Amino acid sequence: NYTPKLIAESIKKNSNININNISSINYKLFPSPRLRLLGSYLEFEKSILIVEDAEIDIILNPLSVINYKIINYNKILIKRGFSIIKINKANQLFSYIKKNKKKINIEKNNIILLKENKKLFEISDGQVKLSSSKKNQQLNINGLFFDHKTSFILKNRFDGSTKIILKIPKLDISTEIILEGKNNFKTYEGLANIKVLNNFFQFNFVKKKNIIIKKGFLRSSMINSLFEGEVFFNPFFSFHLDIEPSTLNTGNLI
């Protein structure tokens, strides 16, 4: 029989994942040979990704199933439960994706994205795909955000920058951000393109203690404007913007 100790040692050795709290282990022959673990807690590398209360299928190499002393697997499939992804550990996550040789898929999972231990947003019934190529490492998340289909992509590009894409089609929201991070993303700068209900925003920004917005541009059906300013997070969220209208579409006011 496959023991929890053998499974934990194999997953740690081959995928650098710590696994705990295995409540049950079942062997399934169909649709392919696999071990099914229930109630498990997974910690990827140094807490770059955490999965709790999940159902885990370890898809075994068919040629090795007769040897119970060795676990040779091709893929890990994680279902249900919830996952925690820390955005400020994006570089470590991309490094993990690049080094990992085993396929890892996450399905029907609630996914919580954190920034400095604060929740950014949560996607329910989510599907996560980790992929790597010579030029990019990429994290794809698809699921529901307030019952609306949502697509979130985190991509590490060959030039060292990070691209973040968020799309919620039903709400007419589309966001694309390119980040240049320093000190594990404690400080960063970048370019944001945001479209909300036919309103288009573009601006450069620098994040240190606060977020400084530069060279901002707003285009809507009624007005085009330039803007700059600063966004504050302490002691509470607030912002100050200097807005300079450049074009007023008076025809849309009638």
Describe these PLM feature segments:
Residues 1-16, 47-49:
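N-terminal type II signal-anchor transmembrane helix
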Residues 2, 133, 195-196:
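Short alpha-helix boundary/capping motifs
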Residues 17-20, 45-60, 88-91, 116-129, ...:
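Amphipathic hydrophobic-ligand
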Residues 20-117, 122, 131, 137-140, ...:
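Flexible beta-edge/linker motif
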Residues 29-31, 131-135, 156-159, 182-185, ...:
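Short, ordered beta-strand-loop transition motifs
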Residues 42, 78, 83, 130, ...:
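Short beta-strand element of the conserved SAM-dependent methyltransferase core
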Residues 83, 135-139, 160-162, 186-188, ...:
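Hydrophobic residues embedded in beta-strands of well-ordered beta-sheets
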Residues 106-111, 162-167, 187-193, 211-218:
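Transmembrane beta-strand segments that form the barrel wall of outer-membrane beta-barrel proteins
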